[in-house]
Regions:
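Accessory C-terminal segments flanking Radical SAM cores
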Residues: 1-12, 185-245
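Conserved alpha-helical substructure of the radical SAM core
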Residues: 1-120, 134-142, 146
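Structural detector of well-ordered beta-strand residues that form the stable sheet scaffold
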Residues: 94-96, 122, 159, 187-188
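Conserved strand-turn element in the central/C-terminal portion of the radical SAM core barrel
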Residues: 93, 148-171
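Non-cysteine beta-strand/loop elements that form the S-adenosyl-L-methionine
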Residues: 115-129, 186-193
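Short, well-ordered alpha-helical microsegments
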Residues: 102-104, 169-172, 238
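Active-site beta-loop-alpha junctions enriched in small/polar residues
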Residues: 67, 98-100, 126-128, 163-165, ...
Length: 245
């Protein structure tokens, strides 16, 4: 699957996460690990053994995200990013994280690696100190702020991605102002469309009345659009993350 046409890899480096978000596939409605998940992280050795320098040189971008883990949980995430940068200094490296993992020193080291003009980290922060934990369960606000400040201090680009619910919709403007004050380069507020998936009480409500979407048959496949593939935490390649869920 990883052939000469591939230009982008979406990498899930781990299945480990500190949070228990109600709508995440790793949890049973936010109340415990799904039994199909094995807690595992890919080491840098796996990448050195399975992705050659020649293959790295053909890539335009990699980004660490996935379906069930937070990339910052991966013990060797920085070393993995360095391996790609070593063999392709121009490659774009990005990741998504809730920001509540590791130490501020770790985040500073990561920021020092992600120094490309288009490198980035998306921090998923769903509100402010009194609301973020309602959805991002087990994620500590003070920890997020310390880590974000440390990351941004290196000059690395940080993005703030906010899921909007009934309990935090009044804070969107304040969060946007805080993002600007802290030095985030980008802020986005969005609503989730996962309500159709859950029938039990999750302890959260949509920001606005939700109605099921009507989907068309005309789908733009991101694999074809981006010449991309997905690598899961077991070391298996998929056409995209949606097929791996």
């Amino acid at each position: 699957m990883f052939n000469e046409t591939v230009k982008e890899i979406h990498i899930e480096p781990t299945s480990v996460c500190n949070a228990e978000c109600p709508m995440c596939a790793r949890n049973i409605n936010g109340k415990g690990l799904n039994p199909y998940i094995t807690l595992k992280s890919l080491p840098v050795k796996w990448f050195k053994d399975n992705i050659t320098p020649t293959q790295i040189k053909q890539l335009n971008k990699i980004f660490f995200c996935g379906n069930v883990g937070d990339p910052a949980s991966a013990p060797e995430l920085i070393q993995i990013a360095q391996y790609f940068k070593e063999h392709n200094p121009d490659i774009i490296v990005g990741l998504n994280s809730n920001g509540g993992l590791k130490t501020k020193d770790w985040w500073k080291k990561l920021g020092e690696v992600l120094q490309g003009p288009l490198d980035y980290c998306v921090f998923s922060i769903d509100g402010l100190e009194d609301t973020n934990h309602i959805y991002r369960r087990n994620v500590k606000w003070d920890k997020i702020i310390q880590n974000v400040v440390s990351f941004i201090s290196t000059g690395a680009r940080a993005h703030w991605d906010m899921l909007v619910f009934e309990h935090n919709k009044h804070q969107v403007d304040e969060a946007k102002d805080l993002a600007k004050e802290m030095g985030f380069s980008w802020f986005r507020a969005k609503e989730t469309d996962r309500w159709d998936t859950y029938t039990s009480n999750l302890g959260i409500l949509p920001a606005n009345e939700y109605s099921s979407r009507t989907y068309t048959k005309d789908i733009t496949c991101e694999k074809d659009r981006d010449n991309s593939i997905f690598l899961d935490y077991t070391g298996k390649y998929w056409p995209c993350c949606h097929m791996a869920e």
